[in-house]
């Protein structure tokens, strides 16, 4: 299950020392840029590496292992014309499959078996972009390694437009739609998208922090019962309560 939480610790009492859930994590850069029109998002991974992020995480007792970058496929305009309104769709599909393969490999490679609990546990994977078109491949790769998957989508935007209703044609506003099973009747068939298999039910997703949705996104989120918490909910309830309710929505088996 994908978990997006603010701190890598077990809950603690006031006088207890925090217990780390993990002592190492893999870091993967995905310098995508073509999912949207602004130049510069590709610089994200390198800027993070040049910052003190690795040092700050190490001070918390977690070693970040740099696994390099997934180099995006960037075809020419002649090789990659608009299809169904999507810009750079062939570059996107080829990049998505590269990302998924790399993420799946890292997840499986880092899985360690705990003989005491008879459970397998993977080191977390910290992925830095890049524009948000990369999210299709990151989730698809996780799903290939761990099919029992839930997603907390922490974002101001839904990113669940489909090619047939997107006003801009920019794929960074569509990455989730390619993976949600209930939306596949809105996804046009393209041969190079065959490897992008829908891996999420609507009930596997919860949004946190929404504040700016397109009309079709609002319709699909409500129609398919996707759990969501707006920024107003975060301000009113507090982030801890929102995260607990979001986790309960996607995985009722969790106990707090």
Place the predicted regions along the sequence by residue.
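Conserved alpha-helical scaffold segments that buttress catalytic/binding sites
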Residues: 4-256
């Amino acid at each position: 299950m994908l978990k997006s939480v603010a701190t890598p610790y077990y809950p603690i009492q006031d006088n207890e020392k925090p217990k780390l859930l993990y002592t190492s994590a893999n870091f993967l850069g995905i310098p995508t840029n073509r999912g949207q029109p602004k130049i510069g998002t590709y610089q994200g991974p390198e800027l993070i590496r040049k910052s003190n992020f690795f040092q700050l995480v190490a001070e918390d007792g977690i070693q970040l292992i740099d696994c390099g970058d997934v180099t995006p496929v960037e075809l020419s305009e002649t090789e990659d014309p608009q299809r169904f309104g999507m810009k750079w769709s062939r570059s996107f599909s080829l990049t998505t499959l590269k990302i998924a393969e790399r993420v799946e490999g890292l997840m499986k490679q880092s899985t360690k078996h705990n003989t005491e609990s008879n459970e397998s546990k993977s080191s977390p994977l910290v992925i830095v972009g890049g524009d948000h078109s990369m999210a299709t491949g990151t989730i698809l790769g996780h799903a290939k390694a761990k099919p029992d998957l839930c997603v907390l989508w922490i974002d101001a935007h839904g990113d669940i437009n489909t090619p047939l209703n997107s006003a801009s044609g920019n794929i960074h506003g569509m990455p989730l739609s390619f993976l949600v099973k209930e939306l596949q009747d809105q996804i046009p068939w393209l041969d190079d998208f065959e490897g992008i298999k829908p891996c999420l039910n609507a009930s596997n997703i919860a949004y946190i922090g929404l504040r700016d949705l397109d009309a079709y996104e609002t319709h699909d989120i409500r129609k398919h019962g996707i759990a969501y918490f707006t920024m107003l909910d975060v301000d009113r309830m507090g982030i801890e309560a929102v995260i607990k309710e979001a986790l309960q929505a996607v995985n009722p088996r969790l106990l707090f």
